[in-house]
Every structure is written in structure tokens, then in C-alpha cells.
Amino acid sequence: MKQLLFLLLFLPLLGLSQPFTFVPDDNFEQALINLGVDFQLDDYVETQGIDTITNLYINSDSIADLTGIEDFIALRNLSCANNSFTTLDLSNNPVLYEVNCSVNQLTFLD
């Protein structure tokens, strides 16, 4: 009976989103800090702080990796021109409307 109660109470918690988003590129994270979205350079950003952002302008910030952009689920406009990343996967950004990723070294865009 205790095991059943435990499962009923904690099983729904497995579906909750992660509280932090992994952002391995220090320049990307620093750009988020400069925008007031993050506070500490530690490779993690609070997901609840980025999941409502609709516009993101991170041009000329020497960013080589945009890992973490997938958790910007409300993002409509992204300007990330003049950086140095080679891949950009925006397949998890369902409402994205406008992207400017010019002057990068893109070999893959999704």
C-alpha cells in the first residue's frame, strides 16, 4: 500500500520540466547575463527565466555554440548574427517567426 501511495504521489513529478537549462558556451551565457536573464557564469540558466522570452538579440558576442536555445520555447525573434557557430538547431522553438543568423560559419541549420 505504501508503495502504491508513493507511486501515485511522485510519478506525476517525472513529467515536470527541468529547472535549469545547460548553456555550455560561456559567451552565450555571458550575453544572457548582460541581458539580465542570468546572474552567474556556471553553464546553467534557470529555465523559468528563459521560457517566456520572445525576442533575443545576441549579435557579435563571439558565440560558438547555441546549445540551450531549445528551451526558449516562446522565442519569436532571434538575431544572432556575426558570431562563430557552425550549427543551429531551432526545431524545438515552435513559435519562432524571424531569424537573423548571418555572418556565421553555418554548415547545419534546422
Question: Where are the predicted features?
Answer:
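Short, intrinsically disordered, charge-balanced linker/junction segments flanking boundaries
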Residues: 107-110
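Consensus positions within tandem repeat domains that build extended binding/scaffold surfaces
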Residues: 97-103
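N-terminal capping/linker segments that flank leucine-rich repeat
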Residues: 5-79, 88, 94
